[in-house]
Curated annotation (Swiss-Prot):
Organism encoding this protein: Caenorhabditis elegans
One Pfam assignment: 7TM_GPCR_Srh
Name of the protein: Serpentine receptor class H-72
Predominant subcellular localization, coarse grouping: membrane
Localization in the cell: Membrane
Bilayer-crossing regions: 30-50, 66-86, 110-132, 155-175, 221-241, 259-279, 292-312
GO annotations of cellular component type: membrane
Coiled coil: none
Topological type in the membrane: Multi-pass membrane protein
Keywords per UniProt: Membrane, Transmembrane, Transmembrane helix
Family label: Belongs to the nematode receptor-like protein srh family.
Domain of life: Eukaryota
InterPro entries: 7TM_GPCR_serpentine_rcpt_Srh (IPR019422), Nematode_rcpt-like_serp_H (IPR053220)
Amino acid sequence: MSEASLSTYYTTIYPTKCPPDPRFLVSKEGLAFCCQIIGFISLPMHFFTGYCILMKTPATMKHVKLSLVNLNIWYIISQVIVSFFITSYNFYPSLASFSVGYATALNFPTVVQICILYTINDAVHVSITLLFEIRSSLILKNRFRISSSRGRGYWLAGNFFGTVFITSPVFFNLADQNAEKMKILEAIPCPSKEFFLEPITVFATSGAWNTYLLISRSLKSIYMLQIIFFTSCCIYYLVIVKTDQVSAQTRRIQARSFYGLIIQTLIPAAFTLIPSVLISSRSAPDQLVNNLVSISYAVHIVVGSLAILLVHHPYRLFIKSIFVKSKESVIVPVVSTSMFKVIK
């Protein structure tokens, strides 16, 4: 399919069939503006979270301090990339997108930008999974615990590079872009004008590549399977099986930390799951909803950092100490009026 066919569709069919969409958030400028505002507001919060982790983490949390620092660093990197450099403008439900960030202005190919975005997303997922692994391995009775730093290093490398290699072939096998765009127009006849004017990248979904995408997505769910496994270990050894070798206070502290980790993970996850459910429940695609998904993804990153502060008790106490000052008793001097009496 030639580029002329796509151009002909845009100049002849599109104006008569598709009325202009004046909504600001549908435009690439609206999406970029919202994500940049979120980025400017979020970065100070990320740095404050990093300060709390580095300076206010008590000795009882020393085993998870480095993993929290690691997660915070990847949150910061992800926020900068998503809010400023690679803000993804997606045409759901098709696998077509482009970036409205600064990386496009710097002439980075769209496929390279998407590859970078996927890689950073994988790093965040591995960092979250690492928190569950460490929480599980801190239980000495856990027969599945990773007890050595070398073993944990192999585990981290396998998780990160394994998922990156799984999805890499997709980025190096792009189909005929104009032909794929015409196929998308059959299902979505009235996309936003950016579909025709911007450097859209469409991933191959036909034939064997459709099967490969399904398999690769299934394999990427290994993050969730590992989290479920580590969670099961924690529940089994902290709640179901109780041993006299661990004091009740220690078990209570470990259980509280585990429950906090669950909440810390679920809070930001809700900001991505809810929009995804909203998209899947709609009968017709809406670019406004698509862009709201990208905005919610930018929001969920900073929500992840705030969840660290709100879930862990030492950080909550520090925040409270900033805003709530202890009341100081004010001494008001009392002067006797007898000193001012005039003796007649």
